[in-house]
Amino acid sequence: MDAKKLILVGGGGHCKSVIDVAESAGFSILGILDIPENVGKTVLSYPIIGTDDNIPEYVDKALFIVTVGHIKDPNLRIKIHERIETAGGRLATLISGTSHVSKYSSIGEGSVVMHQAVVNADAKIGKGCIINTFANIEHDAVIEDFCHISTGAMINGN
């Protein structure tokens, strides 16, 4: 498997933003998995090639990233992550080329750090997190698994 090939799971608005981050990070997007009625359509010229039922077909071909946003409730994102892991898939971690991530911080698998976000020294980001555009995670902050830090949010250090 080429470590820079990527399958996106979820074809809505958040998917569009993640496409931009994935491209800036040098990933090659093979396609998108979404709901059945969207198969055959495109998102920013990338094809919707199947549904999450097709995850097992791609575990040896690409890494995965969940591109379902759901700010209020992470349960759908958690279920998709679990489905990928159960199938033997690996989750990518995407970091925008325009963000700043301290070498002293840690970012969990399946997380996305969007454009212009800042993750400072000794901050810890869990798995499956969304650190959205212009969010600022200061020193020593801990963001648990599957949290969505919204656009422009500021999380101060200790």
Pin down the residues of each PLM region.
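Glycine-rich, phosphate-binding/catalytic loops in enzymes
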Residues: 25, 81-84, 129-131, 147
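Short alpha-helical
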Residues: 13-14, 72-75, 106
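Structural signal for interior beta-strand "rungs" in well-ordered beta-sheet cores
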Residues: 94-157
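Short amphipathic alpha-helical segments
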Residues: 19-21, 77-80, 125
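Phosphate-bearing ligand-interacting subdomains
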Residues: 39-100
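Fold-independent oxyanion-binding glycine-rich loops
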Residues: 11, 35, 51, 68, ...
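Hydrophobic, well-ordered beta-alpha structural blocks that scaffold small-molecule cofactor pockets
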Residues: 1-43, 49-52, 56-57
